[in-house]
Swiss-Prot record:
The keyword Cell inner membrane applies. Peptidoglycan polymerase that catalyzes glycan chain elongation from lipid-linked precursors. This is Biosynthetic peptidoglycan transglycosylase. It comes from Pseudomonas savastanoi pv. phaseolicola (strain 1448A / Race 6). One of its GO terms (molecular function) is pentosyltransferase activity. It is found in: Cell inner membrane. SUPFAM superfamilies: Lysozyme-like. It catalyses: [GlcNAc-(1->4)-Mur2Ac(oyl-L-Ala-gamma-D-Glu-L-Lys-D-Ala-D-Ala)](n)-di-trans,octa-cis-undecaprenyl diphosphate + beta-D-GlcNAc-(1->4)-Mur2Ac(oyl-L-Ala-gamma-D-Glu-L-Lys-D-Ala-D-Ala)-di-trans,octa-cis-undecaprenyl diphosphate = [GlcNAc-(1->4)-Mur2Ac(oyl-L-Ala-gamma-D-Glu-L-Lys-D-Ala-D-Ala)](n+1)-di-trans,octa-cis-undecaprenyl diphosphate + di-trans,octa-cis-undecaprenyl diphosphate + H(+). It holds the Pfam family Transgly. Keywords: Cell inner membrane, Cell membrane, Cell shape, Cell wall biogenesis/degradation, Glycosyltransferase, Membrane, Peptidoglycan synthesis, Transferase, Transmembrane, Transmembrane helix. Disulfide bonds: none annotated. The lineage of its organism: Bacteria, Pseudomonadati, Pseudomonadota, Gammaproteobacteria, Pseudomonadales. GO terms for biological process: cell wall organization; peptidoglycan biosynthetic process; regulation of cell shape.
Length: 236
């Protein structure tokens, strides 16, 4: 009986592994039709009795402002071009910070955030962390860095029910994702840790200070030259 159960478990795991590889491989070229986070937001709105219409328009890489690409990297994951999905230094720093009793600090890379947004539910558990690591590894192995950032910019939430760069640009600044200025991009990047509480178009003093810091980091990263290096940094 035990051997039968173990065989069933192994078979299920193999099917899951093969299926997830296939899905991630397809999404290397095909825009995701939606994300787990979008489904979660929809369900939350129904449960609360206040259904919302999600705002989202997919924009390809070359129709998203380079300013926004650099701003997001500057604010969220400055080692994006270097790591394979996990920033070990940031993880260690977050663990030390949290052990000292400070406010909870995360250390998720852009690749990890893509994994969570696309495939996983909110919350904290060992199962979810394990699945996040699995999908992050697949994304890093099967996608280019450019593709990871493209999917991130089209799936991240920028306000209640507002997903992706184009919807965010329209919602906050009444412009297109391709036309975002350095200042606008820095404000969008500044709210990403908490986009449902902070506003890019009506920023608090903290968000304004964070946006200023992000603009400094953008200059230090090198702007367009950084993106050119990002495009050529991939293994295959």
């Amino acid at each position: 009986m035990l051997q039968f159960i173990l065989r069933r478990i192994v078979k299920a795991l193999l099917w899951f592994a093969a299926g997830s590889v296939l899905v991630v491989l397809v999404l290397r070229w095909v825009p995701p039709p939606g994300t787990a986070l979008m489904v979660e937001r929809k369900v939350e709105s129904w449960v609360d009795g206040e259904p919302i219409d999600l705002q989202r328009d997919w924009e390809p890489w070359d129709r998203i402002s380079d300013n926004l690409k650099i701003a997001v990297i500057a604010g969220e994951d400055q080692k994006f071009a270097e790591h394979w999905g996990f920033d070990v230094d940031a993880i260690q720093a977050a663990i030390l910070h949290n052990e000292r009793g400070g406010s909870i600090r995360g250390a998720s890379t852009l690749s990890q955030q893509v994994s969570k947004n696309l495939f996983l539910w909110s919350g904290r558990s060992y199962l979810r962390k394990g699945l996040e690591a699995w999908f992050t590894m697949l994304i890093e192995l099967l996608w280019s860095k450019e593709r990871i950032l493209e999917v991130y910019l089209n799936s991240v939430e920028w306000d209640e029910g507002v997903f992706g760069a184009q919807a965010a640009a329209q919602h906050h600044f009444r412009t297109n994702a391709s036309a975002l200025s350095v200042q606008q991009a820095s404000y969008l990047a500044a709210v990403l840790p908490n986009p449902r509480e902070w506003s890019a178009s009506h920023p608090s003093s903290y968000v304004s200070r964070r946006a200023g810091w992000i603009r400094q980091q953008m200059r230090q990263l090198g702007g367009d030259e950084y993106l050119q290096g990002l495009n050529s940094s991939r293994r295959w």
